[in-house]
Curated annotation (Swiss-Prot):
This is Box C/D snoRNA protein 1. The lineage of its organism: Eukaryota, Metazoa, Chordata, Craniata, Vertebrata. Keywords: Isopeptide bond, Metal-binding, Phosphoprotein, Ribosome biogenesis, Ubl conjugation, Zinc, Zinc-finger. Interacts with FBL, SNU13, NOP58, NUFIP1, RUVBL1, RUVBL2 and TAF9. Interacts (via HIT-type zinc finger) with the RUVBL1/RUVBL2 complex in the presence of ADP. The keyword Zinc applies. A zinc finger (HIT-type) spans 211-245. It comes from the Eukaryota. The keyword Phosphoprotein applies. Residues 19-28 have a biased composition (Low complexity). Belongs to the BCD1 family. The gene is Znhit6. The modification Phosphoserine is found at residue 39. GO terms for molecular function: ATPase binding; identical protein binding; TFIID-class transcription factor complex binding; zinc ion binding.
Length: 460
């Protein structure tokens, strides 16, 4: 049947196969031929009927089966080779046979007689591709080994953290021991505090004492100079005015050897250091090195000599030179003296500045001891002088004499200051000693009065 079909086939004697889904081509010159759709072919198509038609259908079915196998192999080959997958057609060669083409242009298959396909030969490369993929997997396994090494390193780091934790655990008991020691020290301090309480005794003594100015309130302050207790600022100011106290500690005050402590030694050392520093500062000061107004000082001496007063001036740096405020008034042609008043019975001392020389001594003493015109605070301080019935006596020490020979001039309270200072030696400014006349029981004052009276008698 196959030989008959081949004979009744195409004029070339070759068999014609159509791919699956492809339509057969019409034979050249055939009148009665038809295509797969049933259209009549050109030529004598009416003669081809019967057995030849059945054989062609069987051959077509075999061709379809072969094409199905080829199609499967083409699909597998397209997955491996990307270049062939992009193409939408396949050629299959057949020895000594014509090419079968699809009219729609879907696929062109070429098949050889021995049914050896080119596609099968190209599929041999597929295992090589798989082996390459296996190699890639082996490389990945190498990376996994590296990750495992990193994990071991992290474990070593964790071991170092454990060491730190052990150090922290070791340091914790040390801190606890330190806290116990600090608590023990605090307990010791608490126990020692009752022993330090005797220092508070001086504060308690100060609190129990009364104010020496008002006498009603408890004392809160103590003057570092006169050591008097005070309770408030008004009392402090009042005691300074009554006692003429500066409130500054006397650094040169006498301290007995029994009462001499390390604080006194430190005070003396600091005092000497201050003196040395002041002297060095003065020696470096260019302003102080300039010549003083010596002409004015000579003028003061000459004017005092014309009035019969022997004025002596001390060098710069002495306290009396700094305190002296005596000036000469050119308009009134008179001296304005710096006068110091001392009241031994009340242990008081006052200073009068710019006192005109034509003013009497009674006028100078009136603001101090006058019962009516004196200041109430000063009158209270000088109560012994204000209430005295015998009056007062004004004395002035004789200058330019030996220290063991104390002499005093007795001044007339009804004369002016210039008349009382006439024919006398004055060092910087006059100092008047106001004493009570009825205090003859005091030997020191008695000696002073006797010497002053003798001096006054010899002068007459």
């Amino acid at each position: 049947m196959e030989s008959a079909a081949e004979k009744e086939g195409t004029p070339g004697g070759g068999s014609q196969r159509v791919a699956e889904g492809a339509r057969p081509r019409p034979a050249a010159g055939g009148e009665g031929a038809r295509d797969l759709d049933g259209s009549p072919e050109a030529g004598d198509g009416e003669e081809r009927n019967g057995l030849a038609g059945t054989k062609t259908t069987e051959d077509a079915e075999e061709i379809k089966m072969d094409l199905a196998v080829v199609k499967q192999e083409v699909v597998d080959w397209s997955d491996l080779d990307s270049g062939v997958a992009d193409s939408q057609w396949v050629k299959q060669e057949v020895e000594g046979g014509p090419e079968v083409k699809d009219e729609k242009g879907v696929l062109e298959v070429k098949q050889e007689a021995d049914s050896s396909l080119v596609v099968k030969e190209e599929e041999v490369d597929e295992p090589e591709v798989k082996e390459e993929k296996v190699k890639v997997k082996e490389e990945v396994t190498d990376w996994e080994e590296v990750k495992e090494e990193d994990l071991t390193i992290k474990q070593e780091l964790f071991v170092g953290q454990n060491v730190k934790e052990e150090q922290v655990m070791d340091a914790a008991p040390i801190k606890e021991e330190g806290s116990l020691k600090s608590e023990a020290m605090e307990d010791a301090k608490v126990k020692e505090e009752p022993q330090m309480n005797p220092r508070v005794g001086s504060k308690r003594k100060l609190a129990l004492s009364r104010c020496e100015t008002c006498g009603t309130e408890e004392a809160k302050y103590r003057c570092p100079r006169c050591m008097r207790f005070s309770c408030s600022l008004p009392c402090v100011k009042k005691h300074k005015a009554d006692l003429t106290c500066s409130g500054v500690r006397d650094k040169t005050a006498y301290v007995s050897l029994q009462q001499f402590t390390e604080m006194n030694l430190l005070s003396d050392y600091r005092f000497l250091e201050d003196v040395a520093r002041t002297a060095d500062k003065v020696s470096r000061d260019t302003f102080l090195k300039r010549p003083k107004r010596k002409k004015y000082l000579f003028f003061m001496k000459n004017r005092a000599r014309k009035q019969g007063i022997y004025l002596r001036l001390l060098p710069n740096g002495f306290s009396k030179r700094k305190e002296n405020s005596t000036v000469f008034d050119h308009r009134k042609q008179q001296f304005c003296w710096h006068v110091k008043l001392q009241f031994p019975q009340s242990q008081a001392e006052y200073i009068e500045k710019r006192v005109p020389d034509d003013k009497t001594i009674n006028e100078i003493l009136k603001p101090y001891i006058d019962p009516e015109e004196s200041d109430p605070v000063i009158r209270q301080r000088l109560k012994a002088y204000a209430q005295s019935q015998t009056g007062v006596q004004i004395l002035m020490r004789v200058e330019n004499m030996q220290q063991n020979m104390i002499r005093y001039h007795e001044l007339d309270p009804y004369k002016s200051l210039s008349d009382n200072l006439k024919d006398k030696v004055i060092i910087e400014y006059p100092t008047l000693h106001v004493v009570l006349r009825g205090s003859s029981n005091d030997k020191q004052l008695l000696q002073v009065k006797s010497e002053s009276a003798q001096k006054l008698g010899n002068g007459n």
